[in-house]
A protein has these predicted regions:
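A low-complexity, Ser/Thr/Gly/Pro-enriched, surface-exposed linker/loop concept
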Residues: 60-63, 241-245
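Extracellular/lumenal glycan-associated surfaces
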Residues: 51-54, 85, 236-239, 243
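Core segments of cupin and vicinal oxygen chelate
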Residues: 2, 10-52, 88-111, 153-193, ...
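N-terminal beta-strand motif that seeds the catalytic metal site of vicinal oxygen chelate
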Residues: 1-16, 76-83, 131-160, 234-237, ...
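Vicinal oxygen chelate
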Residues: 87-144, 181, 185-190, 195, ...
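DNA polymerase sliding clamps and clamp-related checkpoint/processivity subunits
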Residues: 54-75, 79, 83, 102, ...
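Conserved secondary-structure micro-motifs at functional edges
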Residues: 62-63, 187, 196, 231-232
Length: 295
């Protein structure tokens, strides 16, 4: 049903500044750029290994992306999941009464797509897309940044979100653990990992990850009496890289506020760029180098 994360959408107010960071500074190619009149936006698609970043600048007041920036500021907007048959997938989602913003797939910037409604994943906006052939494979990395390693989703109920990912898309949870009052679950629909973070649930809750879990009823928004999405949001974006010390030094020399590389919990070394940096567009960005600690 779902084969990978196709792209991560970022709402930006200054496309030129965002391209200077995400394309020029990171050495990543822009593979498509143009207008999306129906959405009131200017869009640039940047290849990152086998996936993409989609930079979206609103050019029309009242567009979904203008409203996003007005209400929440620049930043991570949506995660697009790749499918080889968007018509069949959306038909299944309709049959299962999954809340949809696009009840029928439509032509979009990267292919034929449909957005789920925010309440389908407690406020995290998901898209399903069947990309055009030329936007199906990304680009082989040529610089320090090689791929999107993971996307962080912060959710009010991680266990329920994992069950929805299985129910909606057939994506199983690979690993779950708790640290203090926080629960972490990891899903890998393809090359890119989805890291779900939220409050801990009781230790005996028993997350079921096999196919049989799809037979259990979901706690839908209507069941809770809530009219709209809850508190979920896309909380961070991490790239895998090689030569992390050189990359950090180069970004610092170009004026981007970046920390010092240090050991990462998942192995390797990690460094972060401040979300308020020029062109970073409010995104918590991290770079991870697994060279000395391959996964």
């Amino acid at each position: 049903m779902i084969s990978d994360v196709h792209h991560v959408g970022i709402a930006v107010s200054d496309m030129a500044a965002a391209l200077r960071f995400y394309s020029e500074a990171l050495g990543l190619p822009v593979v498509k750029e143009g207008d999306a009149p129906a959405r009131g936006a200017r869009v640039a698609l940047i290849a990152v290994g086998g996936s993409y970043l989609e930079l979206i600048q609103p050019v029309m007041d009242g567009s979904p992306f203008a409203r996003h920036i007005e209400g929440q500021g620049e930043g991570l907007h949506h995660v697009a999941l790749r499918t080889d048959d968007v018509e069949a997938l959306v038909a299944s989602l309709r049959e299962w009464d999954v809340p949809l913003a696009d009840k029928r797939p439509r032509e979009g910037f990267s292919g034929r797509l449909s957005f789920l409604a925010p309440e389908a994943m407690d406020g995290v906006l998901l898209e399903v897309v069947q990309p055009t052939p030329e936007l199906s494979g990304g680009n082989a990395p040529t610089g320090a940044v090689t791929r999107i390693d993971h996307v962080v989703l912060r959710l009010p109920d991680v266990e329920e979100a994992c069950r929805r990912m299985l129910y909606y898309f057939g994506v199983e949870t690979k690993r779950t653990f708790e640290r203090g009052e926080t629960r972490f679950s990891f899903l890998r629909p393809g090359d890119v990992v989805l890291e779900l973070i939220g409050p801990s649930t009781p230790a005996d809750a028993g997350l079921r990850t096999g196919p049989e879990a799809r037979d259990e009823p979901l706690a839908r928004p209507s069941d809770t009496g809530e009219a709209g999405p809850r508190t979920g949001f896309i909380a961070g974006l991490a790239f895998e890289c090689v030569g992390i010390d050189v990359l950090a030094a180069e970004l610092a020399a170009k004026g981007y506020p970046i920390g010092e590389p240090h050991p990462a919990l998942q192995g390797g070394r990690i460094v972060s760029v401040h979300a308020d940096g020029p062109g970073v567009a409010g995104v918590p960005v991290a770079f991870i180098d697994f060279t000395d600690s391959p996964r």
